[in-house]
């Protein structure tokens, strides 16, 4: 059991008999009374996000998970296929189980497969990934003076804002937690 005041983004808990990933957790105190812990939880199986308020001091069970290194192989329809690096077993995860991580997956990339009771329930991405720009506006001389950026589409379909000097075909690093441009690869 973990106290709700200790919940942090990325943790997995069991709530209403389902496994949830904590997307946000913040503490709110009201006058003299005890505080509230406001959380945003994402159901690992269904992908639904719900907001739950816990009274300060409550405890929730932490989900017992295991992580195994795996390699992303390919996508076939609505399923993404991974191979564990220790025993070379293949696992398929649905698009709902992958969630927004699909925008960062490139074939042969290494990820952590998340298991609960021997069943894969999701993946953990590395902090940054290298992706290729496939579509962006051309840059013009003097664009860098104004700062800001321009929209770009990456090889996985992810749309982000990049600096003006980035061109089509450039490899860039993207933060998987925020979806923002980090730098050139």
UniProtKB/Swiss-Prot annotation:
One cellular component (GO) term of this entry: cytoplasm
User: Its Gene Ontology biological processes?
Assistant: peptide biosynthetic process
Q: Which Pfam families match?
A: EFP, EFP_N, Elong-fact-P_C
Report the superkingdom from the record: Bacteria
Instruction: Tell where it localizes.
Output: Cytoplasm
SMART domains on file: EFP, Elong-fact-P_C
Record key words, sorted? Cytoplasm, Elongation factor, Protein biosynthesis
* MF annotations from Gene Ontology: translation elongation factor activity
Please state the pathway this protein functions in, per its UniProt record. Answer: Protein biosynthesis; polypeptide chain elongation
Protein's UniProt keywords contain Membrane: no
PANTHER family per record: ELONGATION FACTOR P, ELONGATION FACTOR P (EF-P) FAMILY PROTEIN
Q: What does the UniProt function comment say about this protein?
A: Involved in peptide bond synthesis. Stimulates efficient translation and peptide-bond synthesis on native or reconstituted 70S ribosomes in vitro. Probably functions indirectly by altering the affinity of the ribosome for aminoacyl-tRNA, thus increasing their reactivity as acceptors for peptidyl transferase.
Listed HAMAP family = EF_P (MF_00141)
Q: Which family does it belong to?
A: Belongs to the elongation factor P family.
Name the UniProt record assigns to this protein: Elongation factor P
Which source organism does the UniProt entry give? Answer: Thermotoga petrophila (strain ATCC BAA-488 / DSM 13995 / JCM 10881 / RKU-1)
| Gene transcribed to yield this protein | efp
